[in-house]
Amino acid sequence: MTEETHPDDDSYIVRVKAVVMTRDDSSGGWFPQEGGGISRVGVCKVMHPEGNGRSGFLIHGERQKDKLVVLECYVRKDLVYTKANPTFHHWKVDNRKFGLTFQSPADARAFDRGVRKAIEDLIEGSTTSSSTIHNEAELGDDDVFTTATDSSSNSSQKREQPTRTVSSPTSCEHRRIYTLGHLHDSYPTDHYHLDQPMPRPYRQVSFPDDDEEIVRINPREKIWMTGYEDYRHAPVRGKYPDPSEDVDSSYVRFAKGEVPKHDYNYPYVDSSDFGLGEDPKGRGGSVIKTQPSRGKSRRRKEDGERSRCVYCRDMFNHEENRRGHCQDAPDSVRTCIRRVSCMWCADSMLYHCMSDPEGDYTDPCSCDTSDEKFCLRWMALIALSFLAPCMCCYLPLRACYHCGVMCRCCGGKHKAAA
């Protein structure tokens, strides 16, 4: 690997743990690359080896145990990406085939989003060194606003467009910098002085809705996505600030204002309920001078009971965790139905007779009429059912299983990470 294409830790837009696979066309199967082993595979932004000043994206894989580089593949616009199953994806570039066996479906989905985002940026041409960020919808809570200055002299009436200045941050994990345009349209030029110190940036704090976590993978953001074990043994980040972060990126500005005065009309309550004595004038009640205590909000209560699932890596609430909520969790009822109905016979037949060159085939009981082998597949299943009559029980059992999932009697449950 040359020095120009060597990725650093900050250049990765997504990084997961997986086993790098290679395709053997002679046997028609996938085998572990260089003897197998868990590798750190990610999509990173690097400079093109041609040295034309343009940058691209590289899929880089490094085995953990010996730091051996087992995968290097540049992302191209004509890359063909195939999701064979939830934990195995493969792609093809220039008649070269690469594959990855992920540790969880969530890792596979994250890597797929990272590759698709890299291809989109290559198509849009936003990876050149002179490209600018023009989509304001991608700006988040860590945006840094810089004031544009007029570059014209005092005697010149010519105004130049504000230039975009992007500086690499040193302390925070990721930070996007952009310039507020058209600042010169409403103010005269003598209001801007180059010798004025720039105001200290403050972090804008927002509280997103906890019902759904939104994960955005942007190659311009230096987001580090860790592997499967890291999510199980590390606390969930993003909801509470990390005290280990640099002080410069952890300031919060609160607007100071006069505290509003509230007029409370309290009901008449017997003083005995509060342990107060009788009023000296003989009245049975007294004025309550204490403010009513604030109860814990429902959101804070739910936050304390939410955990991350080890199977699908989604956040769930312990009180609402019932059967059928996690599709990736193991389910003994579903496994028993497939074994009793001998569905392994149908899988074997479709794999050997109706699979594509990559070994992928359609679900045996799929009703998608757009499949070119729809009629042939069902005719083969009907013929196979004469040899294995127990296959006829699969559809009724599957219908009962779906009813059980709707009634929350069957299906997998979320399991909290340790």
Curated annotation (Swiss-Prot):
Query: Which residue stretches belong to region Disordered?
Result: 127-172, 275-302
**What keywords were assigned to this record?**
Cell membrane, Cytoplasm, Cytoplasmic vesicle, Membrane, Phosphoprotein, Ubl conjugation
Q: Can you supply one Gene Ontology CC term for this chain's record?
A: transport vesicle membrane
SMART domains named in the record: WH1
Report whether Ubl conjugation shows up as a keyword of the record: yes
Positions of modified residues (Phosphoserine): S206
State the CDD domains in the record.
EVH1_SPRED-like
Presence of the UniProt keyword RNA-binding in the record: no
Identify the residues that the record assigns to the WH1 domain, covering every copy.
5-122
Its record classes its membrane topology as: Peripheral membrane protein
Q: Which PROSITE patterns match?
A: KBD, SPR, WH1
Pfam families from the entry? Sprouty, WH1
Q: Which GO terms describe its biological process?
A: negative regulation of epithelial to mesenchymal transition; negative regulation of ERK1 and ERK2 cascade; negative regulation of lens fiber cell differentiation; negative regulation of transforming growth factor beta receptor signaling pathway
Report the superkingdom from the record: Eukaryota
Q: What are this entry's molecular-function GO terms?
A: protein kinase binding
**Main localization (coarse):** membrane
Coiled-coil-forming residues are none
Q: In what ranges is there compositional bias, type Polar residues?
A: 146-156
Q: What does its PTM field state?
A: Phosphorylated on serine and threonine residues. Phosphorylated on tyrosine. Phosphorylation of Tyr-228 and Tyr-231 are required for ubiquitination. Ubiquitinated; leading to degradation by the proteasome.
Q: Which InterPro entries match?
A: KBD, PH-like_dom_sf, SPRE_EVH1, Sprouty, WH1/EVH1_dom
- What are the Phosphotyrosine sites (modified residues) in this protein? Y228, Y231
| Record's function text | Negatively regulates Ras signaling pathways and downstream activation of MAP kinases. Recruits and translocates NF1 to the cell membrane, thereby enabling NF1-dependent hydrolysis of active GTP-bound Ras to inactive GDP-bound Ras. Inhibits fibroblast growth factor (FGF)-induced retinal lens fiber differentiation, probably by inhibiting FGF-mediated phosphorylation of ERK1/2. Inhibits TGFB-induced epithelial-to-mesenchymal transition in lens epithelial cells.
Q: How does it assemble?
A: Homodimer and heterodimer. Able to interact with SPRED1 to form heterodimers. Interacts with RAS. May interact with ZDHHC13 (via ANK repeats) and ZDHHC17 (via ANK repeats). Interacts with TESK1. Interacts with NF1.
| Protein name (record) | Sprouty-related, EVH1 domain-containing protein 2
Q: Which gene encodes it?
A: SPRED2
